[in-house]
């Protein structure tokens, strides 16, 4: 069982994928104590399988990040920014709201995310008791053979736990990781392209 998000002492989220031609992704609500899957739902991850003879290569993109307050499970997909909000209070995945990109998995498969020269990447997710924070970075790339990924700007998108968009904060630094500390009420950010040279602290 591949646990990707621990919700509380009894619940966790895991992911699974099929590679049999259907090539689908699933999120699962799991009872930690027994390992039993309580409920599952299709995800919007893109699973690509390439077979050459007896060899098989697998590429999984647009995977979600997770945050939960114990009652709601929020997902944000890395390349599309789609936000899904599930009510998990009854031990099931009850979708209560989706925000943003509405493309189907089949439509997303037509997008070559690796060849995007410029766009937005929803790279990090954190939360407080009052809101969910998504770090969105604007990026550009230079093509091979001298491939380079550069972060151009960073902003913080906030939502309440019901899925209602709140404020957008434009950060004065380019960062690609964020973590909210509930004890201090501060947001700690850094850019690993700079090899952890600086940590930037924001008050919200």
Which role does the model predict for each range below?
Residues 1, 35-59, 91-117, 172-173:
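Surface-exposed loop and turn segments in beta-propeller and other repeat-based domains
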Residues 179-204:
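Blade-level signature of beta-propeller repeat domains, shared across WD40, Kelch, NHL, RCC1
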Residues 2-10, 55-71, 76, 117-128, ...:
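Structural signature of eukaryotic scaffold interfaces centered on beta-propeller domains
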Residues 17-20, 54-55, 73-76, 113-115, ...:
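Short consensus segments that form the blades of beta-propeller domains
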Residues 24-35, 147-164, 201-204:
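Beta-propeller blade signature
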Residues 115-159:
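Loop/turn-rich, solvent-exposed surfaces of beta-rich toroidal or solenoidal domains
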Residues 1-25, 43-49:
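Asp-box/WD-like beta-propeller blade repeats and closely related beta-sheet repeat scaffolds
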Residues 14-19, 134-151, 194-202:
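Short, conserved, GDST-rich strand-edge loop motifs in beta-rich repeat architectures
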């Amino acid at each position: 069982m591949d646990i990707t998000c621990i919700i509380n002492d009894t619940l966790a989220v895991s992911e699974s994928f099929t590679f049999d031609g259907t090539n689908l992704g699933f999120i699962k609500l799991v009872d930690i104590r027994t390992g039993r899957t309580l409920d599952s739902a299709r995800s919007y991850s893109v699973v690509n399988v390439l077979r050459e003879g007896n060899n098989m290569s697998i590429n999984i993109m647009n995977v979600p990040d997770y945050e939960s307050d114990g009652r709601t499970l929020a997902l944000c997909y890395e390349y599309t920014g789609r936000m899904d909000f599930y009510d998990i209070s009854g031990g099931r995945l009850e979708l209560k709201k989706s925000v943003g990109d509405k493309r189907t998995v089949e439509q997303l498969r037509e997008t070559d995310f690796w060849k995007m020269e410029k766009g937005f990447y929803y790279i990090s997710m954190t939360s407080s008791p009052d809101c969910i924070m998504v770090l969105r970075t604007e990026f550009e790339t230079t093509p091979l053979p001298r491939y380079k990924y550069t972060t151009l700007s960073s902003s913080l998108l906030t939502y309440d736990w019901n899925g209602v968009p709140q404020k957008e904060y434009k950060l004065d630094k380019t960062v690609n990781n964020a973590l909210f500390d509930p004890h201090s009420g501060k947001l700690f950010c850094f850019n690993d392209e700079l090899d952890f040279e600086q940590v930037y602290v924001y008050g919200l």
